[in-house]
Amino acid sequence: MKSKVVLLPCGEYKEEKIYTLLKQGLDFLGGLETLIPKGAKILLKPNLLKKAEVEKAVITHPVVVGAFARILRENGYEHIVLADSCGHGTTQAVIRGTGMDTYLEKYHIPAIDYSEGVKTVYPQGIQAKEFILPKELLEQDCVISLSKMKTHALERITGAVKNSYGFVYGFHKAKGHTQYPSADSFARMLIDLNKCVSPKLYVMDGIVAMEGNGPGSGDPVPMNVMLMSTDPVALDSVFSRLVYLKPEMV
């Protein structure tokens, strides 16, 4: 059975519009409760590479995060946290002043930092058979990935698959770049990581994306779309097509 990827055309960061589109996207995927059981402990994982002005398209836009948080709360999901293994700074420091902190306060969602890494064995892995994952991640029942559409110096693009690298604890992220130095080996490791953590849903903010010297120093470019899927490879394949890349080259 082929994976389903939902494309949601959207040209601006207006909360009501994004909220409505995300609800439509969830309906196309079978409904929120078919993806995430009621009562589940949920971790929201945006792209929080570093502290930057929202307009620079470095991080997942706060309105996208806020609209999805609103949907979860309105549907009765009680146990929600937000976290990322940020490239620079703490989670709270990166989101402070972006507007994301305001949304989290409104919907009573704590922004947490990872405190401890736990060796996690994944024997099914092809490239990587173990990861050091945060204790706080392993305490959750399910993960929702909220990625940002960007270029990437090593992997050409950073999207749904690459967003999961923020699950690797602390300095082990830097170690991974040494351990898997080529684009191919790093990409295969990322696939193993996604299968190991197994986020239940992937949402991509591509309303304003990043081109050029990504993932942190590129230029904002309007792509006017959000994407949703339960399959990160399928989602990134569509992303690749949108920017005229062959998916097999990524």
Predicted regions and their residues:
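N-terminal and secondary-structure boundary signal
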Residues: 1-250
